[in-house]
Regions:
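TPR-adjacent "capping" and linker segments in tetratricopeptide-repeat scaffold/adaptor proteins
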Residues: 1-16, 132-134
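Alpha-helical segment of the N-proximal tetratricopeptide repeat
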Residues: 11-43
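Structural signature of tandem alpha-helical TPR/SEL1-like repeats
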Residues: 27-38, 61-73, 95-107, 129-135
Length: 135
């Protein structure tokens, strides 16, 4: 997704940066995590684990447009990522694109029907979960 820059330290691997970014996310330092995870993405573009963490960092730091693009990139790499669909739906919802959010949230719940998180997101959107018997 990003091109390497001269600021990228050559001795830090994408894995090290991912670990550091995830630690920052855990401590709710979302904007700082985004910076670190962008570096990881430049080193290993298109890696699902990096894209997921980067999307979370963008979303939680109030960068919904960047989160949307990142979760779309994640779904290009891993179309079966139920979290990717959930997170894209949440990003679209935050951007005021509720109609576009619905199908992604429904798909996330269909892929992971036990998820109370996905079910609650659909309910908050005003969409009841569909029965598996519905067409």
């Amino acid at each position: 997704m990003q091109t390497p820059t001269p600021d990228d330290a050559p001795d830090e691997s994408a894995y090290d940066l991912l670990q550091r970014g995830q630690a920052l996310l855990t401590r709710n330092h979302h904007a700082q995590a985004a910076i670190v995870l962008e570096r990881a993405d430049r080193l290993e573009p298109g890696k699902g684990s990096i894209l997921e963490a980067l999307g979370r960092a963008y979303f939680n730091s109030g960068q919904a447009s960047r989160a949307q693009l990142t979760f779309e990139a994640l779904l290009d790499v891993d179309p079966l990522s139920h979290f990717g669909h959930y997170a894209l739906g949440q990003s679209l919802k935050r951007l005021g694109r509720r109609q576009e959010a619905g199908p992604h949230l429904r798909l996330a719940l269909a892929m992971s029907p036990q998820s109370t998180l996905y079910r609650a997101a659909l309910t908050r959107l005003g969409l009841p979960p569909r029965s598996s018997l519905e067409p």
